A protein has these predicted regions:
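Short Cys/His-centered divalent metal-binding micro-motifs
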Residues: 73, 77-102
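Histidine-centered nuclease catalytic patch
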Residues: 42-76, 92
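Intrinsically disordered, low-complexity N-proximal targeting/linker segments that flank membranes
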Residues: 1-53, 60
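Short conserved micro-motifs at the rims of enzyme active sites and ligand-binding pockets
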Residues: 61-64, 90-95, 126-127, 158
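Short, well-ordered coil↔helix boundary/capping segments
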Residues: 68-71, 75, 87, 105, ...
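C-terminal, well-folded lobe of enzymatic/effector domains
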Residues: 104-181
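C-terminal, helix-dominated tail/subdomain
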Residues: 1, 101-106
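Alpha-helix initiation and N-capping motif
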Residues: 19, 49, 93-94, 108, ...
Length: 181
């Protein structure tokens, strides 16, 4: 058995076990809150609940003609508090990162560490005036990182799919990740 990263493209349903499992794996890896930099914990924020939110905001993606199939995928989502999500709003990542750094007094290095804790390459979010091609680079990079994490946790190898393989042909059921998490 192997883990096919194309499966991640199909995870868009918030109630699906596999969708939740990927978010849980990112939490388990020690992701930190985008605004405070504090360790993310589903139960520690009380009035500021943790949920899975967009990294490239939905509004930004819609304005740039990116399909919902891509922007609503778990690849473009990560655990964030409600206040972090509100601060991000619909701005491009480079803009909301600057806003968070300014308001919270975070250095770029500290913010980059937060992004890396979410399996995000900071350089891919810091692109000034990002384009669809920049979103695509971010998306493919994060998909590879999430696939590597899922494969490591399950003990499976990451499959390198051929171009003709479709996500519906994936042999491995990501729902099994929930049991491993």
């Amino acid at each position: 058995l192997s883990f096919n990263p194309l499966r991640l493209d199909t995870l868009r349903n918030r109630i699906a076990a596999a969708y939740k499992a990927i978010g849980a794996l990112v939490l388990r890896e020690g992701c930190r809150d985008f605004v405070t930099g504090a360790p993310a914990d589903l139960y520690a924020f009380g009035a500021d609940p943790m949920d899975i939110h967009h990294i490239f905001p939905r509004d930004w993606c819609r304005r740039h003609g990116i399909s919902a199939d891509r922007y609503d995928s778990i690849v473009n989502k990560t655990p964030l508090t409600a206040s972090s999500n509100r601060m991000i709003g619909g701005a491009a990542p480079c803009d909301y990162l600057a806003l968070v750094e300014g308001r919270q007094g975070l250095s770029a290095e500290a913010m980059d560490a937060v992004l890396r804790s979410h399996l995000i390459d900071p350089a891919l979010l810091r692109v000034s005036s990002p384009t669809v091609a920049d979103f695509d680079r971010f998306y493919e990079d994060r998909k590879a990182r999430l696939a590597t994490l899922a494969a490591r946790v399950t003990g499976l190898a990451v499959e390198v799919p051929s171009p003709e393989v479709q996500a519906t042909e994936v042999e491995f059921d990501l729902d099994d990740v929930e049991e491993a998490a």
